[in-house]
């Protein structure tokens, strides 16, 4: 499988290429610079893998929660690329992706990922490890006062 994924909903900007079991990524902590960084990241990943966009199987993007502008950047770019290359698109919860990383790197059965929502609040959710090893949301993703979490 060949999958390109973008994440721009937080202060970090990243693009990753999953190519037959191997992951290559570009990552930069760069608040408010995502619109300048993400396209060169995509170009770099595809060039390094000697791939053209139409050779991918699908595109994915972090659907948030997170920065409204950041989510729109990734969603807009992915939708435009997908339309032009006739590729399917998969939106992925940013919190679920964070929980999945916890499960990949530990034996933990639960993860509580949090993202700064500004103004003293956080986006968060409780995830449990499913029987298949995948992050399963328990309840719903919410925004709450940081002191309540």
Where are the regions a protein language model picked out?
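Buried hydrophobic packing segments
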Residues: 42, 77-81, 98-102
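Surface "functional belts" at beta-alpha junctions
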Residues: 88-149
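A generic structural signal for alpha->beta connector loops
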Residues: 20-22, 86, 108
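DPxDG-like acidic metal-binding loop motif
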Residues: 60-94
